[in-house]
């Protein structure tokens, strides 16, 4: 019986119609109703979480509730809204994570734990790649991928390792056109968060690199506060020091690797990094901190303002003080930038892309898609899906919508953990998941 199994029992490798809109839902879930868990998920269901909706810290215990990963059954498929078609595009990959599509349509896949980047080639409209090659290997936990300069004929593929950035000469082929070059020899590494993402600003003058925090909540920083207090003014607003120096931040470099500053601070773990194609705004998809209960702290997706401070570790979602750092940085109160879109806490928001294709209905153009890897620090499982980020006139509304679900089997078992999202050359949406090593293609 499949009544409560979201990976529906389907006999083919294709879902043609998808699922209808959230039982006729016309208004988004708000307040406590928006927190929910995986059982409430449904393609088309919308949520809005506001800062005023947040509970007090410690209202529920902090729990360890790791998922049990199982193999994907042949008839287990993700589901999208009605009118969309879901197909298995590629399988047998080694933990595929970030996805990036080159101007010629080639699909670059970071196989992070295998230390390599793979490239898949598929003609427009094809449901399977016609070529599958290793583009680069021997890398150190690669994640972010970017093409430079912008336009139809980039000359370089930049790859962010966990401890630096390299670039490969590129002529649109399935392999580099020359030897790699080290661009940033050293990035902060070690600790809890190893992903490094990168994008170029719309004018191609700066390369932005996101660096996650070393720890959950800067647990060791309190011991250094006395020594560092006189130094805060010498650093960017809200910058972390000590073992967290240049962590929980977006750093800025010139394309040749010369460091030119810190773009933003206090972003605990900006895994997804994307530039909106119309506005040019830089966005982060962010994993927030653990240990404060089921519904704290919300993950978020936000525009990243240059020079802004987003709270970590002292504050969260505006002026809410983390009780584990009470009284440490009162000087920062009132200086925190509140994120744009709050997501169910512990969802583990990862890859981010803005829809720029022509295949989906017109109302999707310019909206975002974000992969939710799934919770472990929540008693009721959440995440394990792809969400649509709603924008209006180029600005985030705070609303997000379940778009692709079906990776959870029951309260303890999951077969898929979404990581990367990308728009294919023909306008299809591509989604990677690293539990069973698959990439899915969603068309309309």
Tell what function each PLM region has.
Residues 27-81, 154, 195, 213-261, ...:
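Beta-propeller domain segments
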Residues 78, 104-129, 173:
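Beta-propeller domains
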Residues 85, 95, 103, 113, ...:
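Beta-rich catalytic cores
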Residues 88-93, 134-140, 183-190, 262-266, ...:
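Surface loop/turn motifs at the tips and blade-to-blade linkers of beta-strand repeat domains
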Residues 92, 96-100, 116-150:
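Blade-loop segments of beta-propeller domains
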Residues 107-109, 155-159, 206-209, 282-284, ...:
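Hydrophobic beta-strand segments that make up the repeating blades of beta-propeller
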Residues 132, 136, 141-148, 155, ...:
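Asp-box/WD-like beta-propeller blade repeats and closely related beta-sheet repeat scaffolds
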């Amino acid at each position: 019986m499949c009544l409560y199994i979201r990976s529906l029992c389907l006999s083919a490798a294709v879902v043609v119609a998808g699922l209808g809109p959230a039982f006729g839902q016309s208004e988004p879930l708000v307040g406590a109703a928006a927190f929910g868990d995986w059982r409430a998920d449904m393609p088309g269901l919308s949520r809005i979480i506001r800062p005023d909706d947040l509970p007090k810290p410690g209202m529920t215990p902090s729990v360890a509730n790791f998922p049990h990963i199982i193999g994907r059954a042949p008839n287990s498929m993700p589901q999208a809204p009605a009118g969309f078609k879901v197909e298995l595009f590629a399988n047998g990959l080694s933990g595929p994570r970030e996805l990036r599509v080159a101007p010629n349509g080639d699909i670059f896949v970071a196989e992070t734990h295998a230390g390599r980047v793979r490239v898949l080639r598929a003609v427009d409209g094809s449901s399977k790649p016609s070529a599958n090659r290793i583009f680069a290997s021997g890398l150190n936990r690669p994640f972010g991928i970017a093409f430079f300069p912008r336009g139809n004929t980039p000359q370089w593929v930049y790859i962010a390792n966990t401890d630096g950035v390299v670039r490969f000469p590129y002529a649109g082929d399935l392999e580099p056109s020359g030897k790699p070059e080290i661009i940033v020899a050293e990035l902060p590494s070690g600790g809890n968060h190893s992903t490094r993402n990168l994008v170029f600003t719309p004018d191609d003058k700066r390369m932005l690199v996101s660096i996650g925090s070393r720890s959950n909540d800067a647990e060791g920083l309190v011991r250094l506060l006395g020594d560092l207090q006189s130094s805060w003014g010498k650093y960017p607003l809200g910058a972390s020091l000590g073992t967290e120096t240049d962590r929980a931040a977006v750093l800025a470099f010139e394309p040749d690797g010369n460091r030119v500053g810190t773009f933003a601070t206090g972003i605990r773990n900006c895994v997804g990094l994307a530039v909106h194609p119309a506005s040019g705004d830089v966005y982060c998809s962010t994993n927030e901190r653990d240990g404060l209960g089921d519904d704290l702290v919300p993950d978020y997706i936000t525009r990243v303002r240059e020079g802004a401070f987003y709270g970590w570790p002292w504050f969260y979602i505006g002026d809410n003080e983390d009780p584990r750092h009470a009284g440490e940085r009162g000087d920062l109160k009132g200086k925190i930038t509140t994120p744009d879109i709050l997501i169910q806490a512990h969802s583990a928001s990862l890859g981010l892309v803005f829809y720029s294709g022509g295949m989906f209905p017109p109302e999707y153009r310019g909206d975002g898609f974000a992969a939710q890897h799934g919770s472990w620090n929540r008693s009721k499982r959440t995440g394990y899906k792809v969400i649509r980020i709603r924008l209006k006139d180029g600005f985030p509304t705070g609303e997000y919508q379940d778009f692709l679900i079906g990776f959870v089997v029951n309260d303890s078992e999951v077969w898929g953990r979404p990581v990367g999202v990308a728009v294919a050359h023909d306008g299809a949406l591509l989604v990677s998941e690293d539990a069973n090593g698959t990439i899915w293609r969603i068309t309309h």
